Amino acid sequence: MHPTPDALIVIDIQNDFCPGGALAVAGGDEILAPVNALLEAYQVKVLTQDWHPAGHGSFASSHPGAAPFSVTTLPYGEQVLWPDHCVIGTKGADFHPDLNTDAADLIIRKGFRAGVDSYSAFFENDHETPTGLDGYLRTRGVSRLTLVGLATDFCVQYSALDAARLGYDVTVREDACRAIDLDGSLEAARKAMRAAGVVLEG
């Protein structure tokens, strides 16, 4: 019997989330070296990529008079309205050039449906529409996941919570993540992840 493979899920290390990008996470480029090192250490390696059409419903610019980082209600619930970011075909949507994308087995693109955002690597923000990642991991025999990337309190947190809900053993390596920390969102994310049984390391 082969041991169950562990998977590394690398969340959204894209130009728009790194310094100089449209939705830059402070220190977002500082995690590239530790993430690249981790990519050498795991059997199963998945990258996620935020991938929005122009005029996406989560963009503040799609809601006349709305300010970036304000909150609105969309058909699936509350939604933070973001600056335009990770628009399909733009440099901002590309992976950071220093990320070792060649190491990945799979790239999951999310948020490409114009009417619903997708923070999680597993489900869109309606919490129902799957990305296909769960099926991929199960057919690879994976039961343990380590999550790294951007941003701790949004896409990493949502991915970790969904993974725990789906029955995976989940670890988040905080030393290989960075947070937006919008109005205390980082501490709230840590509490939610711990409550769900997610292990926070680093």
Residues covered by each model-derived region:
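Extreme N-terminal starter segment of soluble prokaryotic enzymes
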Residues: 2-8
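Short glycine-enriched, charge-decorated loop/helix-capping segments at active-site entrances
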Residues: 21-28, 121-125
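Active-site alpha/beta core segments
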Residues: 33-144
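Histidine-anchored nucleotide/phosphate-binding helix
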Residues: 38, 156-167
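Short internal beta-strands
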Residues: 46-49, 169-176
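Glycine-rich anion-binding loop/nest that anchors nucleotide
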Residues: 142-155, 174-178
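Short, flexible loop segments at boundaries between secondary-structure elements
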Residues: 172-186
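Short acidic-hydrophobic, aromatic-tinged amphipathic segments that line or gate anion-handling sites
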Residues: 199-202
